[in-house]
Amino acid sequence: MKDAPLPTHYEPWESPVHNALYREHERNPMAKYWDVEGNPYHGIANPEFPYVLTTYRLTEHHTGGGMTRWNSWLAELQPAAFVEISPELAAERGIEPGGWVTVRTARGEAVARALVTRRMRPLRVGGRTVHQVGFPWHFGYAGLVKGSSANDLVSLVADPNVSIHEGKVLTCDIRAGRSQRA
């Protein structure tokens, strides 16, 4: 293993908090990253991007949704892109349930409807409240159902051993309203 001999904890490449265990190594020093145009990084604890963005799958869609967004029976079950946020984050940012939101990273913006739910709970980390934004990654610009792609927001970072993409966690900002750029 490239980052052996012993496993240790590293915060994601973009994290809202500093690594409490290893201040001298905030991130995995062996991680693969691509310092290329269009792939800027937020840095650790960047106040411009204070929220954790996590991407995930939905039961009704397969892989990135490229195959299932074209099936009418599946499109009916999950007809649009959405983001999940807590009632606390919705109140803090003036977001209405079902209203449009814009999720922003240094790499781009995405728009979706807000699903305000207790499933996405604020966390206490490093002595402060850290809010989470959940964004299913099955949507895109083609198919019977369309929507902003969560993958447009993620950075190009991978683990050092098998190059698994670190697209499941990053930092973002979220605001009420629909961006014209997304």
Predicted regions and their residues:
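Interdomain regulatory linker/hinge segments that flank or connect interaction modules
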Residues: 1-43
